[in-house]
Amino acid sequence: LGAFYNDLSAYHSRLTIVVLSEFGRRLGRNQSNGTDHGHGNVMMVLGGNVNGRRIYGTWPGLHPDQLDKRQDLQITTDYRQVLSEILVRRLGNPKLGVVFPGLAAYNPLGIVRGPDLPPDLSANTTTLADTGYQVFVPVIQQCR
């Protein structure tokens, strides 16, 4: 990731990289000494317009009483909160209701710099393409 970021150094002011997983891991081992999918996770954001060198969110703790159902890390920040801020401030796309149906509010954390457009939380548009805004979601296919 560092090499990729360095290779694109000429574009840092236009570059925002988000690294996340679609699932976390449970803290305890299962019957086969592995770990099952959990829901607490981490997300990293890199780029020239990122207010970096900080941790956003709160640490819930690892004591069994602090875990969700005594086995999962608590979720303290909704991933949509982070990604909606990037959509608005970095991609200039305020159509949050189309990208994230059911999102109740736009509450930026201050992770990235950029203009704050008034968010549109309605999902009135048939498809994202109908909005006239862009969302870049890379898809990497598995090579066989």
Q: What residues fall within each predicted segment?
A:
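Feature marks hydrolase-like catalytic cores characterized by long aromatic- and Gly/Pro-rich stretches
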Residues: 2-121
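Long, low-complexity repeat tracts used as extracellular stalks/passenger repeats
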Residues: 119-133
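Conserved functional hotspot residues at active sites or interaction interfaces
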Residues: 138
